[in-house]
């Protein structure tokens, strides 16, 4: 079972909102979300607790609304959930959303362990514009674009590993490598929705200072360098049954009715395709931070999906993903390419 998340949410009085989301999936128990939001005015709200870091567009999209079971390779370059306070708001008749957060700081594609073990912190910021949201122009109404970023100083923390759709590790740093110094991330992002068509694109850059402690001929050496890794994703989707595409969960025009399928009760069917890529800076292999016979320099994922939304609560995904690599096998002197990974995955989700 991939996810089992009974969401407890509500409001205390008029201005206080809360959410607690435990997860019992994958044979373990974890706390995904636990936050309190104070919303006296929509333009300047205050949130505190554990929640999705306000950086990445794909990450911030709710799970039921996703076109694919697994998010793209870009997630290897951005944070997942973190702990801290944020000020955020919605301005100009919902045309602009902003977030300013002070977070504990987590490695890429990971969530906070619920404990802060050092004094280092990350500043997260995001701004997203939907300038034509209230326009009568249907061609521009569904256009949105924004920018997310983080900046922080890491001290002796572990580095993250990069994983495929099938959760195979395709990149990791050598032993003796720790994050030690400034780390920043940039994430330009955008989407476009028009009638049944949906498009989403994102580009992410992760730059961090890494320290390598190694032994050479019995002599202990230490070196610190900055490296940046970059990635992109682009996806397109189309509702075959005529629903209007959206960043939010799409409800079927005609919910599935097995007793009357010939009168339109087939639910909603969506076709989706995605390409995503992460490229690691070559210099970190040359300086001994990573081994090209163990870790790939690049991974490119191609994914297609056919999704069936039966009603307002039930959705079925049928996804296929092919991931190709450059290097990651062989020997250090003569690295070869990792074999491509091919995954077919289906998922039935009940959300209420």
Name what the model sees in each region:
Residues 1-155, 228-263, 268-286:
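Outer membrane beta-barrel
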């Amino acid at each position: 079972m991939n996810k089992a998340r009974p969401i407890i949410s509500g409001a205390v009085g008029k201005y206080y909102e809360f959410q607690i989301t435990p997860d019992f999936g994958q044979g373990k128990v974890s706390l995904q979300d636990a936050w309190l939001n104070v919303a006296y005015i929509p333009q300047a709200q205050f949130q505190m607790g554990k929640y999705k870091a306000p950086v990445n567009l794909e990450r911030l999209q709710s799970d039921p609304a996703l076109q694919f079971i697994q998010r793209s390779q870009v997630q290897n370059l951005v944070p997942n959930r973190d702990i801290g306070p944020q000020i955020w708001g919605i301005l100009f008749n919902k045309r602009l959303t902003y977030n300013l957060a002070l977070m504990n700081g987590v490695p890429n594609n990971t969530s906070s362990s619920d404990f802060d073990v050092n004094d280092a912190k990350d500043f997260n910021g995001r701004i997203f514009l939907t300038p034509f949201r209230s326009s009568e122009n249907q061609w521009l109404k569904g256009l949105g674009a924004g920018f997310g970023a983080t900046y922080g100083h890491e001290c002796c923390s572990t580095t993250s590993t990069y994983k495929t759709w099938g959760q195979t590790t395709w990149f990791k740093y050598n032993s003796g490598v720790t994050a030690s110094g400034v780390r920043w991330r940039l994430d330009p992002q955008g989407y476009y929705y028009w009638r049944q068509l949906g498009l989403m694109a994102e580009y992410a850059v992760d730059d961090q200072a890494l320290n390598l402690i190694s032994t050479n001929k019995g002599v202990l050496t230490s070196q610190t360098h900055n490296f940046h890794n970059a990635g992109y994703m682009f996806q397109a989707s189309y509702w075959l049954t005529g629903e209007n595409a959206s960043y939010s969960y799409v409800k079927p025009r005609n919910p599935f009715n097995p007793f009357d399928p010939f009168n339109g009760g087939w639910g909603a069917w969506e076709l989706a395709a995605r390409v995503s890529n992460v490229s690691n800076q070559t210099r970190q292999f040359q300086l001994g931070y990573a081994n090209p016979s163990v870790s790939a320099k690049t991974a490119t994922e191609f994914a297609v999906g056919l999704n069936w939304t039966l009603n307002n609560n039930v959705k079925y995904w049928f996804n296929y993903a092919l991931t190709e690599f450059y290097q990651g096998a062989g020997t250090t002197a003569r690295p070869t390419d990792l074999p491509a990974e091919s995954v077919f995955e289906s998922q039935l989700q009940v959300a209420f």
